[in-house]
């Protein structure tokens, strides 16, 4: 019996080992790849990864699964010439992997690597299924992301909350937005638009979010759930007798009402919300809340009391939880966060590459005191509206990050974040951003690009490298002070007019670069395309 017990324990150990998220990741990249690596997890007070060699095995070592996955990605890029990207998350690894000749270590003091904007869930991800989400979570882990917004299935939470408050199915569907508009609904900008949603939609999204959160937690990725910040349907005063304020209109859309923190039912409804969230997806350690987004009226609202009530409700649900807030336009209001304890709030400097609020005096959104005592994350927004086109500030993103890090505000800088409105574009910019935490010192843009091209295309080619340098000095060199919202848009998409200038309301059409440089760079890449036949990354670019 003792032998049988020991054998059983060994079998369990083998099953647990096989269930490692890193092994699963490797097998999804290339079947059989997990046999070519040794994975070692080592305790450390800081996030780190090491690349090493033991016999014929490449060793990836790190303090957690996300660090290890980041190390794996680093090895594939800079030792094998394999770049896993949105346009291709699978690759055929060499039968014999290139040996790590000298142990290589990278560590970071950037605790958080954030991902997603609310808008990403509507512009890009509204109809993703588990197959697509699984690839994205793998992409996150490979790029060191450990703090992503996770708002799929929040509509199911609200459905349950409002049902318990006495709302009918029809009334609930008048409040919950349709899939393509839930970003703005959850930012308190509108309600009901794009609905109603069928019952099957709620069930489908709840099931999907459970799988998403399960996989994130297997990696050790901390999901950021939408928290409760006072949003209620616009008719909550008439329906429930609540004391609410009217945040007004957002671009002509009626906003949900804001439940006053002094209303005795604020705590009750917040508790109900968190209870229903916990029931479906478990407790989170991070909650995103963004009341009064983009000009919401605060008339009649005690902002200090509101901030404290929102924080208190979240802490009652989970005493160690942290509020994640977006710095966008006037938010977060200083009066709302000024008296909150340090360590209880993280601020996402959402558009830090163009309109930083961390305390850079050169910014048009300059905040003299930055975010005060609160931790913050340096974010790159880059994409607006899901528009696809070449765009970026390659050199400036590097310079602004280290400028912030070296400033007095650097002591509260705790990470980097991707806050694009639309995903799956301009991979070079996001590759750069996600490497920043692992590079302790400022580095040369051109040298980084040369190494990037080798990683992305699998071999060195001077013509391709020169093409990318040309792009980095033209279309990827948007001026530092330029605040345009993403890529240029084609005037062929504009409403017909005698003198078309803009496509969308906030687009910028004036060239900041010479279009001939982009044409030359494209011609250079085409001239050597035959050398890269079958390389999906070059074909995509």
Which residues are covered by each model-predicted region?
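Active-site-adjacent substrate/metal-binding segments within catalytic domains
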Residues: 110-129, 140
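Catalytic-core regions of glycoside hydrolase
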Residues: 83, 87-97, 116-120, 141, ...
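Acidic, low-complexity N-terminal propeptides/linkers enriched in Ser/Thr/Asp/Gly that mediate export
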Residues: 497-541
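Short, hydrophobic/amphipathic alpha-helical patches that form generic packing surfaces
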Residues: 27-28, 70-79, 142-143, 427-438, ...
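Bacterial Sec-dependent N-terminal signal peptides
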Residues: 1-20
């Amino acid at each position: 019996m003792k032998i049988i017990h020991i054998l059983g324990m060994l079998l369990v150990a083998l099953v647990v080992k096989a269930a490692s998220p890193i092994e699963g990741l490797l097998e999804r990249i290339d079947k059989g790849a997990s046999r070519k690596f040794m994975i070692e997890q080592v305790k450390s007070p800081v996030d780190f990864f090491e690349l090493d060699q033991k016999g014929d095995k490449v060793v990836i070592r790190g303090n957690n699964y996300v660090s290890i996955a980041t190390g794996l990605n680093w090895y594939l890029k800079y030792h094998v010439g394999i770049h896993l990207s949105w346009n291709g998350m699978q690759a055929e690894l060499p039968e014999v992997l290139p040996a790590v000749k000298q142990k290589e270590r990278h560590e970071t003091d950037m605790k958080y690597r954030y991902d997603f904007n609310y808008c990403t869930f509507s512009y890009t991800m509204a109809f993703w299924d588990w197959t697509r989400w699984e690839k994205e979570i793998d992409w996150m882990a490979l790029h060191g992301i450990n703090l992503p917004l996770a708002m799929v299935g929040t509509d199911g939470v609200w459905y349950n909350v409002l049902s318990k408050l006495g709302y009918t199915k029809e009334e609930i569907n008048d409040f919950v937005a349709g899939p393509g508009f839930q970003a703005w609904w959850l930012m308190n900008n509108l309600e009901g638009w794009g609905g109603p949603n069928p019952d099957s939609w709620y069930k489908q999204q709840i099931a999907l979010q459970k799988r998403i959160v399960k996989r994130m937690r297997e990696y050790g990725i901390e999901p950021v759930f939408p928290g409760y910040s006072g949003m209620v349907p616009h008719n909550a005063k008439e329906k429930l007798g609540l004391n609410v304020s009217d945040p007004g209109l957002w671009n002509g859309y009626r906003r949900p009402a804001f439940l006053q923190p002094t209303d005795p039912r604020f705590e009750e409804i917040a508790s109900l919300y968190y209870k229903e969230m916990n029931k479906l997806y478990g407790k989170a350690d991070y909650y995103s809340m963004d009341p009064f987004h983009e000009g919401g009226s605060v008339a009649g609202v005690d902002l200090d009391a509101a901030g404290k009530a929102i924080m208190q409700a979240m802490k009652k649900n989970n005493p160690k939880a942290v509020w994640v807030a977006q710095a966008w336009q006037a938010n977060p209001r200083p009066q709302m966060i000024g008296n909150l304890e340090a360590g209880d709030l993280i601020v996402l400097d959402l558009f830090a590459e163009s309109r930083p609020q961390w305390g850079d005096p050169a910014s048009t959104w300059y905040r003299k005191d930055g975010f005060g005592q609160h931790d913050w994350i340096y974010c790159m927004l880059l994409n607006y509206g899901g528009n696809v086109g070449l765009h970026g500030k390659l050199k400036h993103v590097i310079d602004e990050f280290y400028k912030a890090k070296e400033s007095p505000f650097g002591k509260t800088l705790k990470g980097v974040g991707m806050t694009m409105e639309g995903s799956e574009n301009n991979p070079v910019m996001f590759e750069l951003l996600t490497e920043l935490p692992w590079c302790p010192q400022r580095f040369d843009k051109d040298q980084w690009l040369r190494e990037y091209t080798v990683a992305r295309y699998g071999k060195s080619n001077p013509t391709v490298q020169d093409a990318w340098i040309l792009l980095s000095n033209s279309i990827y060199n948007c001026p530092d002070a330029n605040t345009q919202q993403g890529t240029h848009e084609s005037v062929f998409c504009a409403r017909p007019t005698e003198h078309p200038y803009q496509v969308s309301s906030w687009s910028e059409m004036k060239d900041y670069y010479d279009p001939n440089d982009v044409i030359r760079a494209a011609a250079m890449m085409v001239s050597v395309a035959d050398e890269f036949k079958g390389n999906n990354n070059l074909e995509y670019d």
